[in-house]
Amino acid sequence: MLEIKVEELSKILPSDGPSIDEVKKYLEKYNDEYIVIKCGGSVLVDQNLFNIFIKDITTLNKLGFIPIVVHGGGKRISNKLNELGIKSEFIKGLRVTGKETIEVVEQVLIEFNQEIVEALKKQSCNSETINSKINNIISVLKKMMN
């Protein structure tokens, strides 16, 4: 378990964040644990929210947690598809991803992921890209909707 002194905690924690005592409780219970954080793509296209998100992930990392970020990219994907003249089809709120669409989705998500990783590295937060195209970690079955 990572030992962090109170003086160090006060330097790491944002001034508007939780109290040191509250953080210490979580550190004792969850230090060196993986934390999976899902962040929607619409949050990350706002530069101010993106910067706050990066700062929060960096803070978690400095506290000894191991954050894993799972991100979306809906707005960027829609914008890129529109730019390329590819019409999006949705069924019950889910995007139908044909071959042409999935290639754009993969490209946009990989670029977005690289931006997140680069921003984290600039904050001295150890991070790396993991995605299905490069790391071959996801297999998919076609779902037929009624």
What are these regions (language model features)?
Residues 1-146:
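Nucleotide/pyrophosphate-binding catalytic subdomain
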